[in-house]
Amino acid sequence: VTPPTIPKVTAFITRDDHLLVFRKPFHPGTGTQLPAGTVEPGETPEVAVLREAEEETGHSGYAVRALLTHRLDDMRVYGRDELHDRWSFHLIAPAGLPAIWRHGESDPSSGPDSYIAFDFFWIPLSDAADHLRAENHPALQHLC
């Protein structure tokens, strides 16, 4: 039986030669991550990636520069019985984003009163492959 396919987006947000990433301070085992999420019904991937970037960072004004990759990820290797139809986009950061900041949002998958914090910071694009999971490397190659 083929698992369900869920449309997903990932945002590679750049400013000059740096990439915006985050860590979850209360979940250190999750590592360095990129803004990402699910495409909602009726949304295009382009609209979804902008929404996710705004929701997760707490800032608006991002611009889609390019589609980097579009691939199918089999999440069964991570113990999840689903496929992710993943669209990875290059976004340009708006002017005025700080060097570091914390933002959070509710986490509907963990209950109505749950909250998840994101500590955002910039890393040099040249170092990004050392910080991100291998599944992000193909899209990253289009930035470097």
Predicted regions and their residues:
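N-terminal strand-loop-strand
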Residues: V1-L34, E46
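Short, charged/polar surface micro-motifs in flexible loops or helix N-caps
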Residues: T14-L19, H27-P28, E40-P41, H70-D74, ...
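Nudix hydrolase/Nudix homology domain
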Residues: G29-T32, P98-C144
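A generic structural signal for short beta-strands and their flanking turns/coil linkers
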Residues: T30, P35, T69, L83-W87
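The catalytic Nudix box helix
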Residues: L34-L68
